[in-house]
Amino acid sequence: MTASPSKLAQLRELSVVVADTGDYDAIKRLKPVDCTTNPTLVKKALDLPVYADLIERELAWGREHGGDDRTATVNEVADRLTIGVGVKLAELVPGRVSTEVDADLAHDTQATIAKARKFVAMYAERGVSKDKILIKIAATWEGIEAARQLQKEGIDCNLTLIFNRSQALACAEAGVFLISPFVGRILDYYVAQGQTPASIDEDPGVVFVRTVYNEFKQRGSSTVVMGASFRSTAQIEALAGCDRLTISPDLLEKLDAEHGELPRKLSPAKADNAQFTPIDSDSFASGLAADPMATEKLAGGIDTFAKDLHALRKTIADKLAG
């Protein structure tokens, strides 16, 4: 008797599966289409043997080329390591690698554009074309405006930390390639408020992604919806059929071990053509201001990403000094 396919195998038939990790061995084992990185994942990768040569090479570069401005040297080594990890991952996945622009640039459009262009150039120098990468940017108004320009230059962007409809619609109107709504962090907020959902279909993170997905499809938007920040396999299963789902290795392993039918929950089949109403900075700001959850989680997410980047840089500074 043939064993039934795992839920992970079934999910791959419904959605593009993305690995939310820089763990080289986990990606080899789980075979996602895309993967995504951030400073925390890069910092963890520094402890993995597969990256040992990369780390030593870039630290040696830092020691050789570092001038009097130690901070600039550390920051450059951090960028080189980030791209180096991305290059290794690009060898493994058939699709894209998302690479995050510094979170402390989240409210600076021009600096975000400059950093994105730098990352694309660094990848190109290492033999990775821009069609293999996504530039990950926090979905502030300034970040979305940066993505609008980058998309015009053929640089595809992943707008992250999406918690609110205004953010999602502004990204779609700007022609952003992909957005990452954060399912788990939305749930976390409401659970902390004592509002635990009675069922997965009432999970506010799941409801938000379903709403955005359906509205995008109804409006004929080409912007990809990639659910992110999952707390359980139940949340993932509730979004089966979403364009893409970025999932941590532990939840991918659980899905690979589970069997039973995994029905499609989202489908563009009933989509109707419609047009987006342009969102300006004032309507964007008012939409966020009216949503305490999104306001808190966007600011908190940027702060967490910035702290993670500073932690990566501190680790590099310590290694350079050692």
Swiss-Prot record:
Organism: Xanthomonas euvesicatoria pv. vesicatoria (strain 85-10) (Xanthomonas campestris pv. vesicatoria)
Entry's Gene Ontology BP terms: carbohydrate metabolic process; pentose-phosphate shunt
Purpose: Transaldolase is important for the balance of metabolites in the pentose-phosphate pathway.
Class in the EC hierarchy, top level: transferase
Primary residence: cytoplasm
Family: Belongs to the transaldolase family. Type 1 subfamily.
The reaction(s) this protein catalyses: D-sedoheptulose 7-phosphate + D-glyceraldehyde 3-phosphate = D-erythrose 4-phosphate + beta-D-fructose 6-phosphate
Stretches of the chain forming a coiled coil according to its record: none
UniProt KW keywords: Cytoplasm, Pentose shunt, Schiff base, Transferase
Designated name of the protein: Transaldolase
SUPFAM superfamilies (alphabetical): Aldolase (SSF51569)
Subcellular location: Cytoplasm
Cellular component GO terms held in the UniProt record: cytosol
Record-level Gene Ontology MF annotations: transaldolase activity
HAMAP family: Transaldolase_1
Record keyword Manganese present: no
